[in-house]
Amino acid sequence: MKKYVISLFMLMFAISVNAQNKEQVIEPLPHMVENLELRDLRNKPTHMPYWGDKNMLIFYVDPDKHRQNHDFIMDLEENKLAAGPNIEGFGIINLKDTVFPNSIVRALARKRTEKNKAIIITDTDCNVAKEWGLGDCNNMFVLMIVTKEGELVYCKKGEFSKTDQEEFLRIVNKYR
């Protein structure tokens, strides 16, 4: 009986490690991605806006780290450094990795979007990270560029250095 329990435990551990590794797979850029069904701020099913019509600047944010890169993002918005006729930006809140209740995060996001008219949708199960091969996005602010053809051409996670900011501006200019 003891051997059976130990074998069962080892099997469960191996399955758990394998499942975690699948979520951690990072695909090299560029690669094609799909428009996923996510949730709006009222928790209704929705898809990503602008898909197939415009290049997309996507802010994929863990609410626990929403202030990461704050100064850089404010500079982008205020000075329209990533704006252009061929690109639109929107946010996706990574609800799976936050300690905050989803309803509170959605309510705060609704309040903010009423003021700034930004488009924000939510990802309740880290589907964007898993399906797009982003790897672990917990506690990270992720900035991505997806072409209107559905190709993920830029992805940077975490805190941006000055060099990262310059690289992003150089790349985003191609898609504006």
Would you name each region that the model predicts?
Residues 1-4, 19-20:
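Positively charged n-region of N-terminal signal peptides that target proteins for export
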Residues 139-176:
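Thiol-/selenol-based redox modules, centered on thioredoxin-like
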